[in-house]
Amino acid sequence: MSEAVVLEHAKSAGTDFLMYTGNFCGYCVAAKRLFASKNLSFKEYNFNEHPGMREDVVAATGHRTVPVIFDLRDGQVMFIGGFDETSAYLR
């Protein structure tokens, strides 16, 4: 079910990126600023507001920290990683 959750969120996002975040996360704020600076849209799901979702996303990606970011452009769902990976990816 874990991958199904991510795929369902990606399917309904209608944005360039899908991002899972947490409260008080400086890297999440930095990712939002990065997307804004490049005029890229994103859909955000905050783990603190959706109990149980973190376990599904970790099971699907193996990525245990936030943010967890996916590129949805070109009709594909591509896991990028966290802020550092996304910053390098968008250079």
Residue ranges of predicted features:
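Local sequence-structure signature of Cys/Sec-based thiol-disulfide redox active-site neighborhoods
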Residues: S2-K43
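Nucleotide phosphate-binding site architecture
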Residues: G26, N48, S87
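Residues at alpha-helix termini
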Residues: K38, A60-T61
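Thiol-based oxidoreductase modules, predominantly thioredoxin-like and allied folds used
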Residues: S41-R54, H63-R64
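Short amphipathic alpha-helix with an adjacent loop that forms part of the alpha/beta core around
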Residues: R54-A60, S87-R91
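Structural micro-motif
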Residues: T61-F70
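Non-catalytic, surface beta->alpha helical segment in thiol-disulfide oxidoreductase systems
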Residues: D71-R91
